[in-house]
Amino acid sequence: DLRMSRGLGDVYKRQQLQDSTKVMGGNHAMTGRLTLPTDADIIDETIRLKNLLGADALRDCDGTEMPEELLSEPVKKYATYYTTRKDNEWAMKHPEEIQQEYLISNRITARGETLRIRLMEGFHTEQLKVNTLDDPKRWWEVIDRTTGEVVPTDAWEFDEASGEVEIRTIPYHEYTVSFLAFLIWDPVHMYNFITNDWKDTPHQLTYDVRQPKTRQYVKDKLRKWCEDNPHIDVVRFTTFFHQFTLTFDDKKREKFVEWFGYSASVSPYILEQFEKWAGYKFRPEYIVDQGYHNSMFRVPSKQFLDFIEFQQIEVCALAKELVDIVHSYGKEAMMFLGDHWIGTEPYGKYFAGIGLDAVVGSVGSGVTLRMISDIKGVDYTEGRLLPYFFPDVFCEGGDPIGEARDNWRKARRALLRSPLDRIGYGGYLKLASNWPGFIDEIQNVVTQFREIHENMQGTASYVAPFKVAILNCWGSQRRWMSNQVHHAIWHRETYSAEGVLECLSGMPFEVEFISFDDVRNGIPEEIKVIINVGDAYTAFSGAENWIDEKVLTNIRRFVDQGGGFIGVGEPTAYQYQGRYFQLSDVLGVDREMCFSLSTDKYNEKNDDHFILEDIEGALDFGEGTSRIYAQGGHYQILAMDGEYSQLVVNEYGRGHSVYFAGLPYSPQNCRLLLRAIYYAAGMEQEMKRYYVTNVDTEVTVFQKTGKIAVINNSAQAQHTELYIKGKCAYVLDLKPGEMRWVDDMEDR
């Protein structure tokens, strides 16, 4: 339930909030907790659906309006608020305060002693424009990519008329130019414009709220907006100041998308402040990063981590100023976790200081739900479920009902472990209303969501008596964010690793996210199993951290004394001292890099093991990892691909390890991982305290309310048996996708 918003001091405002809490579902368990979008051309249907679905909040969206006729409805009204766009007049008057992005040119090979590089080749000139206002010699960088050396500024010139940089070169060396460009079309507006085929909508310019004139203007504008919109209860900031990196090519296709990217959070004004704060000179290379733009898969440099820290401090402080303004008018402040979220870092040190009432984000999976629901420092969280009501899904050949079902099945697992306070939808409500059967599907989702809250009554679900830790270079700062390219988007290169977090998002474990510094400082006692998953040399596997003596010895000691270690893909990978997996002794496996082909490996499968006891179907390792072989004297191979291994367990002192060649999300792989974790922890007997026999089903227990949820994660009917304390307590036949509530009989 909604709690007291920050910044509301007088009795009248408190009473307003208490009244709204009742409407939001505090006294009506099977209504409320739902936000619906609306628009000017669907007023009557909005009211009908509000009543049908029990919605207690309405919102506008990008490209829609909140009709005046709905302002008197007895629900909360959300207004989407943009701090960086939708005011072209201001942006055009202050071109120097338009937002900027660091770009890197194509890599061009010199064939003589001079070379001209056209900066905007491959970029869309309606989105980006070279910054010619600030000194290129101060803020740009030309690099010889053959040697890695910076080309002196007196060895190149920018020709503004042609948009080219001319460089004195060494023949057959390769060169790039890193340069600043103005974002003259907001990337999200451009995306929506293209997706919805908006014809007559003006392109929305961006402006940088961090800069002095715009900063004051935006604050004054927000005050006036609050005064002009007394009926709006919740200001839904979408979002604050810096867009994640979303760059289009010259054919209006997405060229570079990094949901965690900081490349568009720069300007000379900001960078001069950073230099004073950091105490050293800024280089464009700290942002463009050889053309990788600090993808989250890259091991972050000290300079990039410094930049993130600085941006958090500044962004969160300025965001607080806007939130304080909203609170002064008796309204709530909600942040959308997406779009211009860069610098807020909800799991960073400064986020709680913003003083937000709520966070809302898009739920594309169990992982992305946990990314929202685990956030602290706000009064409530809200998830915008998929599909978004846009024409790219609600069209001929689209399957919005199937997408809604799949989205809900994944989200529901995570909700039962870490519940959102509210759910909602976005887009054009008319599309959803007109699609046969879709509203019925939404009604089912909303009913199940409310049932979860009704049965849990604000209590936590049962978890195993130990913690599981995900180990990577980002640690707790990027909880539930690892191995992702772009917010819940499937990639062939990542799905075999992403499945680990997706499985964990709905499993009965308390999950911590730890960094290599955490390991160096000593592994916390409550952690019983450490998981390392990812490709070699990425931030998620760990790269050079695996040749740090302290990291290796601390983990070896941890496992030797009874801990568990699970590796997926290329864990602990770094070619050094005759090993590729630096903890091959702990894992019982290594990868053949063709350096040891002369050494014979006598690997044989023996699949008689606790981990495989429930498993009937073929094992799925996704893309897998090739050429894995078992080695040592204490391993057991549970699955093989030809002469190489895919699933291996190993004993190491009093501890255990498990290696998976890959682990994409599936109900069966969730069961595999569940068993692997209990085995690695040496606590197999704990697994059947609460347990269901069918791998397509899962169980969540709320001990304090005496309620148990058994869910069917498949699109088929399933038969399952529920065990409590090792004894069969219920025999259940579940419909496709069903959630069944039963009473906990443990103490009866």
Q: Model-flagged regions — what are they?
A:
Residues 1-16:
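Single conserved hydrophobic/aromatic residue that forms the stacking wall/gate
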Residues 29, 35, 41-76, 223-236, ...:
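Catalytic domains of carbohydrate-active enzymes, especially glycoside hydrolases
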Residues 246-249, 253-256, 430-462, 503-505, ...:
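Extracellular ligand-binding/catalytic regions of CAZymes and related secreted enzymes
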